[in-house]
């Protein structure tokens, strides 16, 4: 049977996952409670403002929160709790993902087994004081000194992956706080999630930025429970005051742009100045030696050639493509190219092609999201591989999925803007007997534009309810079904 047009719907906690061939919709019902803007307007904050931030290094607090060095018994109890949960669901033939405590990440606050959640979170309760302190710190520096690393691609950052798990614990703490009506604690935890994302923006690696985005994303997804809680203050101005964007990725993008030359530093020496044959023999030998550990990462094309004869065969085969690129694409004079050693032509072509395609990809990150939509650097990379062959090896290995990373950044900003719009709607409801507006233009507090399109969000009002949706980013679309809260449909 042809299922090419089939739509599949599954549920993950409060979110419906609606999958179709064209897009993936994440939909949540939000039972909105009326709440006017805070008075004074900036009395509620998430990330502290510049006056209140403390000069200091949040990385110290995060490492202390992740360290169970003095908490051996607590760590073992926490792990035993996890093992017991897995054993229980496996004995019943259920999916291990449904085991406690992980299932609590999909459980509404009102449905949590409170005593068990309190017991589990008690094993890591020491973390909260460090996260409180991290929130107040202006900077975050893990002191990597990455520019001095001999093998930056092999640099391990396990503490960053551990922060993702820390964020999951924070989500459980948030849900428990909502269940226990500890609203200020819930807001503090939400703020800490956002601060983790913003602090990880100071890292040199895109993967660290993406973990930061994931931490903030968990916080934003949880924050809808605040919008559903009558006692929760309005967060409109607190969201408006956040850094824009929360995770810029500028530092990591700058480092990733140079990563190929940081890993293989000898490529920085490759230029148009003629070098003797002995220079290129040494260059190839050093490069082949460095690439020996890269067989599983895409550089096997060089590693496989262990003898000078095999290397000469590879370089000879790559020469025509490199020469064509240098002369036809870059406009170098043919006689000058032909005067260079064959190996120099190949690696010069490799460097210049990499630089050109790299910048064609990275430059788009300096444009607003809607202006990037008409470009497709990936297609140019694939066309270059077909046209020039082996000299595209640096591009194959070192050009990260920059566009996908940029989409993740845009999606986080979109979610924050959706949440800010929700808070503007709460303010409207407070002045209109709990009713939603028919149009976003009726709002007293202006709804932000969708950061993905720089246009107003999609908003459809019908019969007292509404649907608020963002534009599709990387085939993912967020939809919020807005229902005025009545007794029994809020946390």
What are these regions (language model features)?
Residues 1-491:
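Short acidic linear motifs
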């Amino acid at each position: 049977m042809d299922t090419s047009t089939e739509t599949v719907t599954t549920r993950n906690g409060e979110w419906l996952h609606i999958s179709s061939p064209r897009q993936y919709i994440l939909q949540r019902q939000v039972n909105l409670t009326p709440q006017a803007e805070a008075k004074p307007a900036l009395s509620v904050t998430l990330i502290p403002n510049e006056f209140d931030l403390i000069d200091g290094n949040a990385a110290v607090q995060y490492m202390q929160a992740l360290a169970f060095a003095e908490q051996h018994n607590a760590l073992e109890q926490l792990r035993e709790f996890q093992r017991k949960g897995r054993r229980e669901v496996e004995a019943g033939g259920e999916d291990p993902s449904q085991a406690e405590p992980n299932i609590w990440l999909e459980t509404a606050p009102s449905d949590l087994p409170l005593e068990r959640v309190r017991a589990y979170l008690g094993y890591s309760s020491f973390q909260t004081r460090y996260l409180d302190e991290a929130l107040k710190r202006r900077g975050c520096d893990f002191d990597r000194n990455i520019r001095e690393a001999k093998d930056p691609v092999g640099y391990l950052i396990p503490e960053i992956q551990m922060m993702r798990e820390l964020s999951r614990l924070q989500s459980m703490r948030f849900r428990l706080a909502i269940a226990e009506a500890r609203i200020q604690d819930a807001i503090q935890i939400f703020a800490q999630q956002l601060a983790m994302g913003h602090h990880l923006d100071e890292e040199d690696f895109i993967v660290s930025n993406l973990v930061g985005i994931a931490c903030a994303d968990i916080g934003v997804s949880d924050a809808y429970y605040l919008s559903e809680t009558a006692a929760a203050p309005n967060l409109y101005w607190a969201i408006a005051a956040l850094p824009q964007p929360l995770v810029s990725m500028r530092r990591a993008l700058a480092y990733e742009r140079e990563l190929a030359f940081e890993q293989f530093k000898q490529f920085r020496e490759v230029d148009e100045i003629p070098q003797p044959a002995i220079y290129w023999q040494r260059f190839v030998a050093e490069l082949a030696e460095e690439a020996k550990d890269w067989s599983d990462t895409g550089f096997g094309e060089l590693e496989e050639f262990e003898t000078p004869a095999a290397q000469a065969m590879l370089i000879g085969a790559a020469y025509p493509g490199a020469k064509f690129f240098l002369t036809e694409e870059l406009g170098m004079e043919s006689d000058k190219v032909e005067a260079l050693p064959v190996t120099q032509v190949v690696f010069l072509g490799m460097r210049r092609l990499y630089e050109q395609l790299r910048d064609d990809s990275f430059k788009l990150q300096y444009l607003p999201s809607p202006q990037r939509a008409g470009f497709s650097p990936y297609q140019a990379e694939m066309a270059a591989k077909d046209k020039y062959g082996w000299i595209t090896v640096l591009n194959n290995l070192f050009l990260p999925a920059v566009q996908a990373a940029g989409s993740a950044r845009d999606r986080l900003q979109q979610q924050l803007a959706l949440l800010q719009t929700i808070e503007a709607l709460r303010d409207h409801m407070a002045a209109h007997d709990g009713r939603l507006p028919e149009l976003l233009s009726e709002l007293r507090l202006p709804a932000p534009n969708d950061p993905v399109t720089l246009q107003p969000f999609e908003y459809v009002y019908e019969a007292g309810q509404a649907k608020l949706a963002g534009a599709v980013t990387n085939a993912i679309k967020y939809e919020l079904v807005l229902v005025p809260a009545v007794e029994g449909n809020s946390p």
